[in-house]
Amino acid sequence: MKVLTDLQKRIFAIVKKENGKPIPPGIVVRMMENQAGFPGKQQVYRAIDDLLEWHIFRKSGGATNQLLINYELADPVLDQKFQGILNLGNKNTGFVRPLDDDKTVYYIHFSNLAGALDGDLVEFCPLDKPQVGDKFDAAVLKIVKRSRVLYAGNFLIEYSDFGQEFRIVADNPRFYLTPIVNKASVPAELESNTKVAFQIDEYDPANNLCKVSIQQILGNNDEPLINLKAIMLDHSIVFEDNDVVEQQAAKLQFDEKEQSKPYRKDLTELAFVTIDPATSKDLDDAIYVKRTDKGFVLYVAIADVAYYVQRNSELDIEARHKTSSIYLPGYYVVPMLPERLSNELCSLNPNEKRYVVVCELNFDHEARLNFSEVYPATIVSQRRFAYSEVNDWLEDSDALKDESATVLESLKAGFTLSELIAEQRKKKGTIDLSHSETEVVVDQNYYPIEIRFLTHGKAETMIENLMVVANEAVAWTLTNHKVHLPYRVHPRPSKKKLQMLLENIVELKITQPNFVLDTVTSTQIAAWLKENKDNPSYDIFVILLLRTLGKAFYIVNPLIHFSIGSHHYTHFTSPIRRYADLTVHRLLWMNLFTPERFTDTEREQLNAELEQICETINDTEIKINGCERTANDYLTTLYLSKQVGQTFHGFISAITSFGIFMRMDENNFDGLIKITSIPEDFFVFEKDRMVLRGKRTNKVFRIGDRLTAKLTEIDTVQKRAILTLV
C-alpha cells in the first residue's frame, strides 16, 4: 500500500468529493490554488502523475482525460455474470469482453482481478457504478481456466539472517503475483540465476501471492538461446519431443512407383528452380515460366506434403497442434513437420525427384489470366537460388553466366510476368505496405552481433507476385467445385478505425483522402498511399495504416482479402510450414485429384472440422506473432545494452499517456521517452489529437516529429530501451 503525502491526500479528497464524476486535472489545480499552502502547479501535476502511476487515479479515457478514483467499493451485480478472456495492460489493470459480445468493454481494476492473469478465461460481473466513457467497471468472480500451465522465470537463491531463501522472478511483466517456491520441488543441483518453468499450485488473491512448483530446468538465465526457449514457453508454445512422430517420419521413403500413377504428370524435363532466403532449408515452392505466342505459362510447383502426411496420422495430429513452423530471430526454427520431411522428402532440393502439386496458369501478353488448372506432378528442381544471387544477376548479367540458357530464359520471363501481374493487381486494389524492416544477426551462441536492415529486391517481389496469383487461382478452383476451404481474409477497416487514423495523421501533413469511410475500397487506399509517397512522414504513415488495417485470418466463408484486393484467397504455397496450406492440399486430393480414393464420410468429416481448424490456427498465429515480437525485442535490447550512453536519431512513432516512443534510425527499434523525463514542463496527453502538450510552455510533441535522444537504460523486464531527450 502506498503512503500518500499530505499534498496527495488533499488531491485525493478533491477528486473523491465528485462522487464518481470525472474531474479535469486543471480544475483540481485551480481548486488547490485557493487553499493555504499551495505548492505550485508543477508540484500538483507531479503528484497527480504519481497517483495515476500507482493506480489510485485513472483517466476517463475521453478527449479531456479527466480524473477518477480508480477503485471504489461497489456492490457486484451478481445477476449479470459473463465469461471472457482477460487482457492485462503494462500496469496490470485489465479489460475484458464477454465471449458473446465483443463490442462491450469492461474495465477491471488491479484490486478486482482475484488472482487472474493475462489471457485467463474468467467469470466476471459488472460493479454497481456509473458507466465511464465507453467502459463499465467489473470484477473477476473466478478463474474458469488458466491460459497456460507453465510460466517461465529466473530462479534465485538468496541468503539472509533467516537462512537460504528461494525466489522466482517471472519473465512476463504482467505476472503480478509473487511466487512462493515449494522447496520440495527444487532439485538439489539447481543453481541460482537459472531459467525455470514453474506451475501455479495455489494462489492467494487477497495478498497477490501464489505457491508454485518447479517443473523444468531450462538453463542458464544469461544465455540467449535459453531465453528464446523461455519466451516460447511464456507464449504457450510448448512442444515436447514426440518420438512416435519422429519414428513415423523416419519410415517414409520416396516411392518411385508413385510417379507413374495416371493422375500425376511428369514435368521432370521442365527447368524448375527454387528461390529462397540463403538460410532456408524447407523449400516449399519452385517455379518455371515460359513465353508463348499467346503470352505466358506459369508453373508453380508446391511440395506434395499431403502425399506423405496422411490425415489423422500422428504426423498430421502433431502438425495440426503446431499449426505452423516458428521462425524466431537468429534463425532459430521450430518446424511444423519433422526434418525428415521438412528438409528432405518434401523440400524441393535441387537435382532430386520430388512429388508436387502444380498450379499451371496461362496469361495473355498483359498478364490477364486466361485459365488455370491444378494437378499432381513430379519435378526435378534444376537449381537452388538464394534471393541475393538472383538480385545480383539483375544488376550484372554475368553473375549467372554459367547457368543454362533454359533456366535464364525462365527467370527473364518470370520477371517480365511479375511486373505485368503487379500492374494488373494494382487495378484490383493491391495495397503496397512495404516499409523498412530489420533482422537481428546472432553468433553461434545466439548473442546478437548486428541489427541489419533487410533489402527487398526484385527477386523477392517476383516470388511474392507469382505465389499470390497461384493462391488466388487455387481458391477459385475449389470454390467453383463447391468445396469449402480455409479462406485467408482481411476485412475492410472499420469506419471508427479509419476515423482514428485521420485524426492521428493531422499533424503529418498527409493529403486527406477523398473517399467515403464506410465504403472505402483497397484501390482508394492504394491511390492515397501513392499520393503521399514523397511525404517525409511516409514511413510513419504506412506504420499507422498497418495498425488500422488489422490482422488477416482464416475463415470458411469467402470474405474479401482487403490489402490484396481479392474476393477469393487462400494459402496453398507453403504446406511444409503452414497447416492451412496442407489442409488446402488435402481438399484438392479428396475432391479433385482422386475423389474415388476417399469416402463421402471422410469428406464430410474434414468439412465439419474446417471451422475448428481455422479457429485453432488463428489462435495459435496470435501466440506465434507475439512470441516472435517478444524474441525480437529481447535480442534487440540485449544488443543495445552495450550502447547505453550513445545518442540516437529518429521520429516519434507513437504517443501514449506515459510517454513517447521514438523509432531510432540506426536500428528501427522503438525506444521509450518517459513523460516524466521530459524537461522544462509538465506534459499532458491529448488523446483526441494524439499529442503531448506542455501545460506552461504549450510545447507540442506530434507523431512524426524528428528527435535526438540518448539511450540511458535497458529495461530487461519490459524488454524496452529507455531514452532521454538531448
Curated annotation (Swiss-Prot):
One of its GO terms (cellular component) is cytosol. InterPro entries: CSD, NA-bd_OB-fold, RNase_II/R, RNase_II/R_CS, RNase_II/RNase_R, RNase_R, RNR_Ribonuclease, S1_domain. It holds the Pfam family RNB. The gene is rnr. PROSITE patterns: RIBONUCLEASE_II (PS01175), S1 (PS50126). GO terms for molecular function: exoribonuclease II activity; RNA binding. 3'-5' exoribonuclease that releases 5'-nucleoside monophosphates and is involved in maturation of structured RNAs. Residues 645-726 form the S1 motif domain. Belongs to the RNR ribonuclease family. RNase R subfamily. Its EC number is 3.1.13.1. The keyword Nuclease applies. This is Ribonuclease R. GO terms for biological process: mRNA catabolic process. Keywords: Cytoplasm, Exonuclease, Hydrolase, Nuclease, RNA-binding. Residues 264-592 form the RNB domain. Its main location: cytoplasm. It catalyses: Exonucleolytic cleavage in the 3'- to 5'-direction to yield nucleoside 5'-phosphates. It is found in: Cytoplasm.
